[in-house]
A protein has these predicted regions:
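N-terminal, positively charged regions that mediate nucleic acid binding
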Residues: 1-13, 17-24
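Structured alpha-helical segments in the cores of large, soluble enzyme domains
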Residues: 100-101, 126-137
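Glycine-rich, N-terminal phosphate-binding loop and its surrounding beta-alpha-beta segment
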Residues: 24-83
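Hydrophobic alpha-helical hairpins/lids featuring a short glycine-rich hinge
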Residues: 61-118
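Active-site helix-to-loop segments that bind/position phosphate- or nucleotide-bearing substrates
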Residues: 123
């Protein structure tokens, strides 16, 4: 897990970041306890399409154009969805290569954000930066970061 900071002229904030393939309840609990921000899962367009996710708002009017989708939860294997264990399970399910929209439900307690193709060269956001950093790392499945504002 690391802290990713942006330019002081943008948001001037940091995000806790780790790769979703390494998710566990301890890391989610750390983010919730110390980051105290919204726990988000960055997805590329392909993974978001597999999950059948739609944007949270039909017209994005936020200052930084963050591409939030509807919130999600694993369809099976969770209780209320809010616990660190449940959110960890949701992230594991959502980042599987063979996932489909049948595996998740909305609304939920994990907030996906779709990264823009082209990374930080297209949008200088934490979402794209975390994906760009994860790309060279060789994992057995998708390299999709989990982020939480600090």
């Amino acid at each position: 897990m690391y802290i990713l900071v942006d330019d002081e002229n943008r948001e001037n904030e940091g995000d806790l970041v780790f790769n979703a393939s390494d998710v566990n309840s301890k890391k989610i609990n750390f983010m919730a306890k110390y980051g105290r921000g919204l726990i988000c899962l960055t997805l590329n367009k392909n993974q978001a399409n597999r999950l059948g996710l739609t944007f949270m708002a039909p017209v994005n009017q936020s200052r930084n154009q963050t591409s939030f989708t509807v919130s999600i939860e694993a369809k099976k294997g969770i209780t209320t969805g809010i616990s660190a264990k449940d959110r960890s399970r949701t992230i594991k399910v959502a980042t599987k290569k063979n996932v489909s929209k049948k595996d998740i439900v909305s609304p939920g307690h994990v907030f996906p954000i779709i990264s823009r193709d082209g990374g930080v060269l297209v949008r200088a956001g934490h979402t794209e930066a975390s994906v760009d950093i994860a790309k060279p790392v060789s994992y057995t499945h998708l390299t999709l970061p989990t982020i939480c504002s600090v």
